[in-house]
Amino acid sequence: MTSFVFVTGNANKLREVKAILAAGDSGIEVTSQSVDVPELQGTTQEIAIAKCKVAAEKLGTACVTEDTALCFEALNGLPGPYIKDFLANIGHEGLNTLLNGFPTTRATALCTFAYSPGPGEEPILFEGRTEGNIVPARGSKVFGWDPIFQPLEGGGRTYAEMDGEEKNKISHRYRALEKLRAYLSEQAK
Protein backbone atom coordinates (compact mmCIF):
# COMPACT_ATOMS: atom_id res chain seq x y z
CA MET A 1 0.00 0.00 0.00
CA THR A 2 1.40 3.37 -1.05
CA SER A 3 0.30 6.38 0.94
CA PHE A 4 0.91 10.10 0.90
CA VAL A 5 -0.49 13.32 2.30
CA PHE A 6 -2.20 15.54 -0.26
CA VAL A 7 -1.48 19.08 0.87
CA THR A 8 -4.74 20.98 0.46
CA GLY A 9 -7.43 22.69 2.43
CA ASN A 10 -9.82 22.47 -0.53
CA ALA A 11 -12.43 19.75 0.05
CA ASN A 12 -13.46 19.75 -3.63
CA LYS A 13 -9.89 19.07 -4.80
CA LEU A 14 -9.47 16.33 -2.20
CA ARG A 15 -12.73 14.68 -3.29
CA GLU A 16 -11.61 14.71 -6.95
CA VAL A 17 -8.14 13.36 -6.15
CA LYS A 18 -9.54 10.52 -4.04
CA ALA A 19 -12.17 9.64 -6.67
CA ILE A 20 -9.60 9.53 -9.47
CA LEU A 21 -6.99 7.56 -7.53
CA ALA A 22 -9.56 5.10 -6.14
CA ALA A 23 -10.48 3.91 -9.64
CA GLY A 24 -9.08 0.52 -10.56
CA ASP A 25 -8.06 -0.49 -7.02
CA SER A 26 -4.76 1.39 -7.20
CA GLY A 27 -3.69 0.56 -3.65
CA ILE A 28 -2.94 4.24 -3.03
CA GLU A 29 -4.09 5.73 0.25
CA VAL A 30 -4.56 9.49 0.33
CA THR A 31 -4.95 11.58 3.45
CA SER A 32 -4.96 15.35 3.46
CA GLN A 33 -3.61 18.11 5.55
CA SER A 34 -3.59 21.83 5.13
CA VAL A 35 -0.04 23.12 5.49
CA ASP A 36 0.85 26.78 5.51
CA VAL A 37 3.17 27.16 2.54
CA PRO A 38 4.27 30.47 1.03
CA GLU A 39 2.31 31.74 -1.98
CA LEU A 40 4.99 32.00 -4.61
CA GLN A 41 5.12 33.49 -8.07
CA GLY A 42 6.53 31.60 -11.02
CA THR A 43 5.52 28.79 -13.34
CA THR A 44 3.19 26.04 -12.15
CA GLN A 45 6.20 23.74 -12.07
CA GLU A 46 8.28 26.10 -9.89
CA ILE A 47 5.36 26.72 -7.56
CA ALA A 48 4.47 23.02 -7.17
CA ILE A 49 8.10 22.05 -6.45
CA ALA A 50 8.63 24.84 -3.90
CA LYS A 51 5.36 24.03 -2.10
CA CYS A 52 6.20 20.32 -2.07
CA LYS A 53 9.66 20.85 -0.57
CA VAL A 54 8.25 23.00 2.24
CA ALA A 55 5.38 20.58 2.90
CA ALA A 56 7.66 17.52 3.01
CA GLU A 57 9.88 19.23 5.58
CA LYS A 58 6.92 20.33 7.72
CA LEU A 59 5.09 16.98 7.52
CA GLY A 60 8.13 14.70 7.63
CA THR A 61 6.52 12.25 5.21
CA ALA A 62 5.62 11.59 1.58
CA CYS A 63 3.40 14.31 0.20
CA VAL A 64 1.85 15.71 -2.94
CA THR A 65 1.16 19.34 -3.77
CA GLU A 66 -0.71 20.73 -6.74
CA ASP A 67 -0.66 23.90 -8.74
CA THR A 68 -3.27 24.59 -11.37
CA ALA A 69 -3.25 27.13 -14.18
CA LEU A 70 -5.72 28.35 -16.76
CA CYS A 71 -3.76 29.71 -19.71
CA PHE A 72 -5.51 31.92 -22.26
CA GLU A 73 -3.96 31.67 -25.73
CA ALA A 74 -4.88 35.29 -26.56
CA LEU A 75 -3.04 36.54 -23.46
CA ASN A 76 0.14 34.49 -24.01
CA GLY A 77 -0.68 32.15 -21.15
CA LEU A 78 -2.15 34.56 -18.62
CA PRO A 79 -3.74 34.31 -16.12
CA GLY A 80 -1.85 31.00 -15.84
CA PRO A 81 -0.94 30.07 -12.26
CA TYR A 82 -2.52 33.33 -11.03
CA ILE A 83 -6.02 32.21 -12.03
CA LYS A 84 -7.16 32.03 -8.40
CA ASP A 85 -6.30 35.71 -7.86
CA PHE A 86 -7.82 36.77 -11.18
CA LEU A 87 -11.02 34.86 -10.35
CA ALA A 88 -11.22 36.37 -6.85
CA ASN A 89 -10.77 39.90 -8.20
CA ILE A 90 -12.72 39.97 -11.46
CA GLY A 91 -14.90 36.85 -11.39
CA HIS A 92 -16.14 34.68 -14.22
CA GLU A 93 -17.56 37.61 -16.18
CA GLY A 94 -14.33 39.58 -15.88
CA LEU A 95 -12.30 36.64 -17.16
CA ASN A 96 -14.56 36.52 -20.23
CA THR A 97 -14.26 40.29 -20.67
CA LEU A 98 -10.46 39.99 -20.81
CA LEU A 99 -10.87 38.13 -24.10
CA ASN A 100 -13.15 40.72 -25.73
CA GLY A 101 -11.58 41.91 -28.97
CA PHE A 102 -9.32 38.90 -29.35
CA PRO A 103 -9.86 36.44 -32.22
CA THR A 104 -9.66 33.37 -29.96
CA THR A 105 -11.06 32.12 -26.68
CA ARG A 106 -8.79 29.05 -26.65
CA ALA A 107 -7.34 28.08 -23.30
CA THR A 108 -5.35 25.28 -21.72
CA ALA A 109 -6.19 23.92 -18.29
CA LEU A 110 -2.91 22.79 -16.72
CA CYS A 111 -2.45 20.76 -13.55
CA THR A 112 0.96 20.10 -12.04
CA PHE A 113 1.37 17.68 -9.14
CA ALA A 114 4.67 17.48 -7.27
CA TYR A 115 5.39 14.29 -5.32
CA SER A 116 8.08 14.01 -2.66
CA PRO A 117 8.86 10.70 -0.94
CA GLY A 118 9.88 12.73 2.13
CA PRO A 119 12.04 15.50 3.57
CA GLY A 120 15.19 16.31 1.63
CA GLU A 121 14.00 14.47 -1.50
CA GLU A 122 13.68 16.30 -4.81
CA PRO A 123 10.01 16.42 -5.90
CA ILE A 124 8.96 14.70 -9.12
CA LEU A 125 6.44 16.45 -11.40
CA PHE A 126 3.36 15.04 -13.12
CA GLU A 127 1.43 17.27 -15.52
CA GLY A 128 -1.90 17.04 -17.23
CA ARG A 129 -3.43 19.35 -19.84
CA THR A 130 -6.88 19.77 -21.28
CA GLU A 131 -7.54 22.07 -24.23
CA GLY A 132 -10.74 24.08 -24.43
CA ASN A 133 -12.37 27.48 -24.73
CA ILE A 134 -13.42 30.21 -22.32
CA VAL A 135 -17.20 30.71 -22.43
CA PRO A 136 -19.79 32.66 -20.41
CA ALA A 137 -20.38 30.92 -17.08
CA ARG A 138 -22.69 27.90 -17.19
CA GLY A 139 -23.41 25.26 -14.58
CA SER A 140 -22.63 25.10 -10.87
CA LYS A 141 -20.39 27.85 -9.54
CA VAL A 142 -19.04 25.72 -6.68
CA PHE A 143 -15.61 24.86 -8.08
CA GLY A 144 -13.41 27.76 -9.20
CA TRP A 145 -13.33 28.43 -12.92
CA ASP A 146 -15.17 25.24 -13.97
CA PRO A 147 -18.22 27.25 -15.19
CA ILE A 148 -16.20 29.10 -17.86
CA PHE A 149 -13.97 26.30 -19.16
CA GLN A 150 -15.48 24.25 -21.98
CA PRO A 151 -13.12 21.38 -22.85
CA LEU A 152 -12.88 20.50 -26.54
CA GLU A 153 -13.86 16.93 -25.74
CA GLY A 154 -16.73 17.92 -23.43
CA GLY A 155 -19.59 17.77 -25.91
CA GLY A 156 -20.15 21.53 -25.74
CA ARG A 157 -20.48 21.56 -21.95
CA THR A 158 -18.35 23.30 -19.34
CA TYR A 159 -16.64 21.36 -16.56
CA ALA A 160 -19.35 22.72 -14.24
CA GLU A 161 -22.12 21.19 -16.39
CA MET A 162 -20.60 17.71 -16.15
CA ASP A 163 -21.06 15.29 -13.30
CA GLY A 164 -17.92 14.48 -11.33
CA GLU A 165 -17.34 11.10 -12.94
CA GLU A 166 -17.58 12.52 -16.45
CA LYS A 167 -15.29 15.46 -15.66
CA ASN A 168 -12.77 13.17 -13.99
CA LYS A 169 -12.35 11.20 -17.22
CA ILE A 170 -11.09 14.19 -19.24
CA SER A 171 -9.81 16.80 -16.80
CA HIS A 172 -6.30 18.15 -16.55
CA ARG A 173 -6.23 16.90 -12.94
CA TYR A 174 -7.17 13.38 -14.07
CA ARG A 175 -4.41 13.33 -16.66
CA ALA A 176 -1.77 14.43 -14.15
CA LEU A 177 -3.01 11.97 -11.51
CA GLU A 178 -2.90 9.09 -13.98
CA LYS A 179 0.82 9.80 -14.44
CA LEU A 180 1.30 9.98 -10.66
CA ARG A 181 -0.62 6.72 -10.18
CA ALA A 182 1.51 4.94 -12.81
CA TYR A 183 4.69 6.20 -11.15
CA LEU A 184 3.63 5.13 -7.64
CA SER A 185 2.48 1.72 -8.91
CA GLU A 186 5.87 1.18 -10.55
CA GLN A 187 7.70 2.24 -7.38
CA ALA A 188 5.63 -0.18 -5.28
CA LYS A 189 6.81 -3.19 -7.32
From Swiss-Prot:
NCBIfam families: RdgB/HAM1 family non-canonical purine NTP pyrophosphatase. Its EC number is 3.6.1.66. Pyrophosphatase that hydrolyzes non-canonical purine nucleotides such as inosine triphosphate (ITP), deoxyinosine triphosphate (dITP) or xanthosine 5'-triphosphate (XTP) to their respective monophosphate derivatives. The enzyme does not distinguish between the deoxy- and ribose forms. Probably excludes non-canonical purines from RNA and DNA precursor pools, thus preventing their incorporation into RNA and DNA and avoiding chromosomal lesions. It catalyses: ITP + H2O = IMP + diphosphate + H(+); dITP + H2O = dIMP + diphosphate + H(+); XTP + H2O = XMP + diphosphate + H(+). It comes from Cryptococcus neoformans var. neoformans serotype D (strain JEC21 / ATCC MYA-565). Binds 1 divalent metal cation per subunit; can use either Mg(2+) or Mn(2+). The keyword 4Fe-4S does not apply. This is Inosine triphosphate pyrophosphatase.
